[in-house]
Swiss-Prot record:
Lumenal side: 402-631, 685-686, 740-744, 795-827
Protein name (record): Inactive rhomboid protein 2
GO CC entries: endoplasmic reticulum membrane; plasma membrane
Membrane topology field: Multi-pass membrane protein
KW Transcription regulation (keyword) present: no
Length: 827
């Protein structure tokens, strides 16, 4: 018994001396004493069996069995009640908005992410913020203070000097070989000290190739006749391996005394700490195979490693050979990281890291993770595919800024060829015409809601058609429905029913006669489907007659307007919903829609045909509100699509790497819909396509990040002026045709509000969760009010301000802003 105590005392003295020698001079660890417990709690203070006793086993001591076998009949932990659906939704929503109870644990991670992004976009940070940025993530002090919270009864303590990997994870080879931070609150981590001394085992992380780069290499290999796997794996063949080389599993040579001290700390506590910043990447075993065994390897710091630590013969029984193939694993999980400080703008400006960067900062830059830009790649792919399909289907309109005039001899209503002109607006984006864009789903107010001016235009056309008649040529060459003034009195006969010459309303009643008509090739007396009889008598108004689908089977009817050959039928021309009875040749030349089945313009709905897409539920009431977000995926041409792709691969991808695809996708879509909604109100007769409002909403996210990081930047006014100059330049570009500045303005306003609500982590650290909740609530309420006001202006109280079109197209020349065939005031 005495010998045992002596041995224990000797071992503990040796252990304490070794720990004192390894302790840095300026390190002090204060362990609060446990509080006095009540007598009833003494039973709970007795040693209990741990969950995993194998992890608590000491290397040098034998485990006592009898004590744990006595407690084998203890009760298992009871089942915990599963949270309800409402609680799960409430907790998930709070975590998504960043106002949950564990926000303080995530605040530091997102604070560092915001600092990195601000340093890339807006310039150098302040000196204090730059020092916080260069510290490891566990050492960054909080803006709210670094004082320790009140200690609990039994705080968890992890030995900061136990650095041996084999003693932290004795049974696993692939666990991270970086020291875990202490769990004592208020004590900074010693990783900065241990990383300098054990820096020879941390090689710099290799840069991984992206999928696009590997695809280009594979295509080049196929052209050269080589194997695809050889081309894609040529770079990775030398240094790629998914686990560390066995000779570098231990960072230091630790003796039994260190083992004795470190065995008191459980494996569960040490493995539960997050080690995402200090975890080093695995070293490649194939990298060390290239080094001859006769020469001692040299670490990156210049320290020669002994051969006894390096060259260990592999054991056949413990060698791991059942891993996933290297090429498959790296193809599935590798991604090209966004290097902070060297973003897209940094590459354009030939920016690089300084050579005097410390190893700690370099490891942080290499290990910092970012989101995958899924939404950016998906959106870019959809934009490119849709643009190519549209151009292949509808062709390219004349390129330029003015109006293009086409002249051709076309057969007209009178049976002679006439010289007619077709005028259309040129498209400098190298894409289809405005009529085709409207048919594809462009933002166009007459297709979204009932327009008063277009409705009045249709009513005027129907009034003229109500007084029309059938003009029959005297030489029996044909007939056409027209006005009396357009029918020649010498060469043709104008058939128009009067009070005495009209047919009776009903075949059985000869009293009341018709006064509206006649109509070429349509008569209630000869039409069998739908028949005019009984309760279904056609009204005495030709603008309300249905389309006759079946005529009486007879060669001659005895009526002059029925026995002639009809020359003209309704044709929907331009984008105003106007209709004209004309020949097929003239209709095709004017890029209209010819209706072979109808005889009157009142029998067709031109606006439904011009708008395309899904037909209206009520042909008289347009209801294609889905154009507000469908137009976000369309472009006016190839150049327009290229501009969007460049913006998305720079600004959008950078923001998505910072905040994630779900937040950026919400801001992109909602700001684009809001911009198109405002454009549909103030510019109702302009066909606009493209994500203009969405792009300015993303620019507003940069302003929000700048405002939230104003106190962190060294020169915030310079960053603000740079962003303002970019927005002003884009606004000036919006004065050109086919670019919608109204969508830019309202997209920017909506993006500004949505960024405050859906980007909660890009904030300065002094705001608490209650203040953040108020900010989110106010931003969402203001956005909802703005969106509701725009909806009311569009559907309930439509407005039409012609002067506002100068904000979206300034007339630099007399014909620079011609009306695109879509006048603000219809005549």
């Amino acid at each position: 018994m005495d010998s045992t105590d002596k041995n224990g005392e000797s071992v503990s003295s040796v252990s304490s001396s070794r720990l004192q020698s390894r302790k840095p001079p300026n390190l002090s660890i204060t362990i609060p004493p446990p509080e006095a417990s009540a007598p009833g709690e003494q039973a709970s203070m007795l040693p209990q069996r741990p969950r995993n006793p194998a992890y608590m086993k000491s290397v040098s001591l034998q485990e006592q069995r009898g004590r744990w076998q006595e407690g084998s009949s203890e009760k298992r932990p009871g089942f915990r009640r599963q949270a309800s659906l409402s609680q799960s939704i409430r907790k998930g929503t709070a975590q998504w908005f960043g106002v949950s109870g564990d926000w303080e644990a995530k605040r530091q991670h997102w604070q560092r992410r915001s600092l990195h992004h601000c340093s890339v976009r807006y310039g150098r940070l302040k000196a204090s913020c730059q020092r916080d940025l260069e510290l490891p993530s566990q050492e960054v002090p909080s803006f709210q203070g670094t004082e320790s919270p009140k200690p609990c009864k039994m705080p968890k303590i992890v030995d900061p000097l136990a650095r041996g990997r084999a003693f932290r994870h004795p049974d696993e080879v692939d666990r991270p070989h970086a020291p875990h931070p202490p769990l004592t609150p208020g004590v900074l981590s010693l990783t900065s000290f241990t990383s300098v001394r054990s820096g020879h085992s941390h090689l710099p992380r290799r840069k991984r190739m992206s999928v696009a780069h590997m695809s280009f290499q594979a295509a080049a290999a196929l052209l050269k006749g080589r194997s695809v796997l050889d081309a894609t794996g040529q770079r990775c063949r030398v240094v790629k391996r998914s686990f560390a080389y066995p000779s570098f599993l231990e960072e230091d040579v630790v003796d039994g005394a260190d083992t004795f001290d470190s065995s008191f700390f459980s494996k569960e506590e040490m493995s539960s700490m997050p080690d995402d910043v200090f975890e080093s990447p695995p070293l490649s075993a194939s990298y060390f195979r290239g080094i001859p065994r006769s020469a001692s390897p040299v670490s990156p710091d210049g320290v020669q490693i002994p051969l006894k630590e390096y060259g260990r013969p592999p054991v056949a029984g413990t060698r791991r050979g059942k891993r996933i193939a290297s090429k498959v694993k790296h193809f599935a999980f590798d991604r090209k990281k966004r290097h902070y400080g060297l973003g897209v703008v940094g590459n354009w400006l030939n920016r690089s890291y300084r050579r005097s960067i410390s190893s700690t900062v370099q490891r942080q830059l290499e290990s910092f993770d970012s989101h995958r830009p899924y939404f950016t790649y998906w959106l870019t792919f959809v934009h490119i595919i849709i643009t190519l399909l549209v151009i292949c289907t509808y062709g390219i309109a004349p390129v330029g800024f003015a109006q293009h005039v086409t002249t051709q001899l076309v057969l007209r209503n009178k049976g002679v060829y006439e010289s007619v002109k077709y005028i259309q607006q040129e498209n400098f984006w190298i894409g289809p015409s405005s009529i085709d864009l409207i048919h594809l789903g462009a933002k166009f107010s007459p297709c979204i809601r009932k327009d008063q001016q277009i409705e009045q235009l249709v009513l005027r056309e129907r009034d003229l058609e109500r007084d029309s008649g059938c003009c029959v040529q005297n030489d029996h060459s044909g007939c056409i429905q027209t006005q009396r003034k357009d029918c020649s009195e010498t060469l043709a006969t104008f058939v128009k029913w009067q009070d005495d010459t009209g047919p009776p309303m009903d075949k059985s009643d000869l009293g009341q006669k018709r006064t509206s008509g006649a109509v070429c090739h349509q008569d209630p007396r000869t039409c069998e489907e739908p028949a005019s009889s009984g309760a279904h008598i056609w009204p005495d108004d030709i603008t309300k007659w249905p389309i006759c689908t079946e005529q009486a089977k007879s060669n001659r009817t005895g009526f002059l307007h029925m026995d002639c050959q009809i020359k003209g039928r309704p044709c929907c021309i331009s984008t105003k919903g106007s209709c004209e009875i004309t020949t097929r040749e003239y209709c095709e030349f004017m890029h209209g829609y010819f209706h072979e089945e109808a005889t009157l313009c009142s029998q067709v709905h031109c606006l439904d045909k011009v708008c395309g897409l899904l037909p209206f539920l009520n042909p008289e009431v347009p209801d294609q509100f889905y154009r507000l977000w469908l137009s976000l995926f369309l472009h006016a041409g190839v150049v327009h699509c290229l501009v969007s792709v460049v913006f998305q691969m720079t600004i959008l991808r950078d923001l998505e790497k910072l905040a994630g695809w779900h937040r950026i996708a919400i801001i992109f879509i909602l700001s684009g819909i809001t911009g198109n909604l405002a454009s549909a109100i103030f510019l109702p007769y302009r066909a606009e396509v493209g994500p203009a409002g969405s792009q300015f909403g993303l620019l507003a996210c940069l302003f929000v990040e700048l405002f939230q990081s104003w106190q962190l930047l060294e020169r915030p006014w310079k960053a603000f002026l740079n962003l303002s100059a970019i927005v002003l330049f884009l606004f000036i570009c919006g004065l050109l045709p086919w670019i919608d500045n109204i969508a830019h303005i309202f997209g920017f306003l909506s993006g500004l509000l949505l960024a405050f609500a859906f980007l909660p982590y890009i904030t300065f650290g002094t705001s608490d969760k209650y203040r953040k909740r108020a900010l989110i609530l106010v931003s969402l309420l203001v956005f909802a009010g703005l969106f509701a006001s725009l909806v009311i202006w569009l559907y309930v109280y439509p407005i039409n301000w012609p002067w506002i079109e100068y904000l979206t197209c300034f007339p630099f020349t007399s014909r620079f802003c011609e009306k695109y065939e879509l006048d603000q005031v219809l005549h």
